[in-house]
Amino acid sequence: MIYEEILRELAYMRIYLGKNIGKVSRKEIYKLYRRYLKLYMLLPIKNPKFDKNNPLYFNGNCYCYALMLPTPKEFYDAYMNACDDVDLPLSFHHDVGFISEKKCFLKPSKLLDNLKSDLDSLGIYYYETDIDSINNHGGYKISLYYNYGEDFHFIREDSDGKWSHKMGYSGSIERVEPSERIFKYNLVTTYEIVKPNIRKLLRWAKVNC
């Protein structure tokens, strides 16, 4: 798909949901949202910069923030006013695995499997690395943390080399020092992730330089 076609389809999904508040099921909204994110990944988006007031993350959690995933207001409002689906949460959740339609289990091995599956679904390449290592593939780093049996957390490296995170859905965006333990969370792994457009830019640079 070309850039203009992607923008048109993204806009259509938002308009469709905005015009059909209360008429769309939660299951259909999640299906549209997954499609939205996969298309969004094809846009010319650079590696992240720190901006504590970025509206892109207003309806998202730490996972959305780490992967730079938007949650447009139309999706959020449609979900909160959707036709009832008893097998889905009442609030719009972004658990690890939701993009690849996998159930989230709060075990490190399951979280890792789900994370890899989500990244694969979005066309994002990932390379295991360390917090202090340089990025060898043109991407940026994310780190997964885990509080045993209770919760997960993500932080990300911004383009200035510093790290930041968002604590849950209502938390603010803040700087954070990466370490083996953050608050009550223990480090599970760190990946350098490379999105489709970054790979495209790197290929172009390699050919033209």
Predicted segments, located by residue:
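Surface-exposed patches in mature extracellular/periplasmic domains of secreted proteins
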Residues: 74-85, 89-92, 128-132
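Active-site nucleophilic cysteine motif
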Residues: 54-72, 104-112, 151
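Charged, low-complexity interaction regions
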Residues: 15-28
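Extracellular glycan-recognition/adhesion modules and their associated mucin-like linkers
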Residues: 50, 55-59, 142-148
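N-terminal intrinsically disordered, low-complexity, charge/repeat-rich segments that act as generic
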Residues: 30-57
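Active-site or metal-binding loop neighborhoods of secreted/extracellular toxin and effector enzymes
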Residues: 161-209
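Short amphipathic alpha-helical heptad-repeat segments
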Residues: 2-13, 32
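...with weaker cross-activation on analogous glycine-rich loops/strands in unrelated enzymes
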Residues: 95-170
